[in-house]
């Protein structure tokens, strides 16, 4: 233990407080124990690595910001930390609780998987729906909801006496429901994608946590809960404060194990990530609810003309054939399509819920995009009850001629200008490979400049967000300190009156002056703390305002980045289809052409081992097994395997000595790593293309080609440094 001020541990099992001095634990909680505390317990050097042998340990829970005792059998050792913590307090011997068995009921997981609890079109598990409905029928209270204490484990989920529950019991039951699930709502894989979305250029993080990244039942449950928490925050006196408090309470429940700082890099977990993620998600839902138009009132009964195709005796037009129907596209792409378009421009896409029959109409009005949900029940469609249209095509056709103002006075427009999926602009105007390459170089440079600007803003945003969190914590500490001093002042004032009266009778002027001086000093100290807190609150408000401005600047850059990336990609696709050499494309992109590998010298491309699928396709193995197969291999060694995402594959490739993973999508146009590159008729065609084409065009960190099939003969490990 010599040299380390403290040691960090991570909770493996949940633990419920048994005594006032105990700490509540959730899996993934980070705990710090001082070296002095362990020495006081008689722990020898090296003994800190075996917490199950130590017994009860005094420490600090970084999630709850509380100190207390926790059982060493419930945690695992992480490593030393340079954090000094107060020494232990004396306590008597106490037996340890039994270490929970993996998968046993000791952990409190008594509910079945979400997939076994409900099925679409239900929005969420019936238990959760009942609890939320009961809470929203009563007065919403974000303070009760955001308490860090964990509820007692519940074994009866029949909810038969729900009407008799008070507000606190309802709030605790929602948390207890999440704790009782056998697995976190946000899977580790989805959390890793969300972590990347927080760091990289992307749209709202909520779009990442949709199927197939997050399983359907988890995605529906998460969306239902986020909508509820968003309503709770909006009704709070201070929505921003409520969002942070709710995220602190629910983040560790929805995401029990924080992801590591990078993928496959062995970095330490990010302890605040569950809170940061949920804070962003709830904030997005609050903003979405604020931006959405008011609920549509019932539609007045009105005779509607028959569709033209039916009137002429033809068959009704198909939704798939409608020019304004774009299918499954993201909200960001919709925003891009409607950018700088006149009022009345519109398109229809599949709803983000991915439930069959649900659609979203996006309409341009007042320079903004208005989202209108298309409801569906029993084969009928509409914007609100009653649902009178027999198809989405019939619904849209009707409002090509009728104003939406009858539903919402602010939507005083018709569906005038459809965004046609058949008339997309031809971006590439040049007609020669050299001219297209030169223009690609210009767009790529613009994209890199914008990316650097965004990265700088993101670093500044992250830094200021951390500082804001520290200041919020400091204000909480000030509040506790003021409370202690004021209680001390009240006690002193009460006692001082008795002693002053006594010393006045005795004529002891010296003691009277000492008591009065102490009282004045205490009042002065309280005033100083109040003043410091006020100054800190002012700094917090100013910095929060600056932080919001940075966020706005980042958001304003995102559409430009997406547009430049899209244009650059279309130029790359054009060059690839025209047979441009990859070496030349690399020069235009400013990518250094690597030295020739053992296969690039082959005159006959048919002799490449890449033609043999058995050299690189390994079938159904998981990420860990793939990393084991590629361990110690040279850069560019790769394999293709089945992905955990249904209908997709995964490419695992060695980059700078580490194994990286990327999804290969299978779409109607072919295989590929991303749109618009899903062009390859088979996995073999894709592998042969990226044998000489760098993956860097898809991800700046993937500076390799698919050079060496993992099962091909030839040198495997990298050569030793000379």
Curated annotation (Swiss-Prot):
Query: What is the annotated signal peptide range for this record?
Result: none
Query: Source species, please?
Result: Mus musculus (Mouse)
Q: Where is the SH3 domain?
A: 4-80
Name of the protein this chain belongs to: Phosphatidylinositol 3-kinase regulatory subunit beta
Q: Which Pfam families does the entry mention?
A: PI3K_P85_iSH2, RhoGAP, SH2
Q: Which family does it belong to?
A: Belongs to the PI3K p85 subunit family.
Gene designation: Pik3r2
Q: Which residues carry this modification: Phosphotyrosine?
A: 458, 599, 649
Which terms in the GO cellular component ontology are assigned? cytosol; focal adhesion; nucleus; phosphatidylinositol 3-kinase complex, class IA
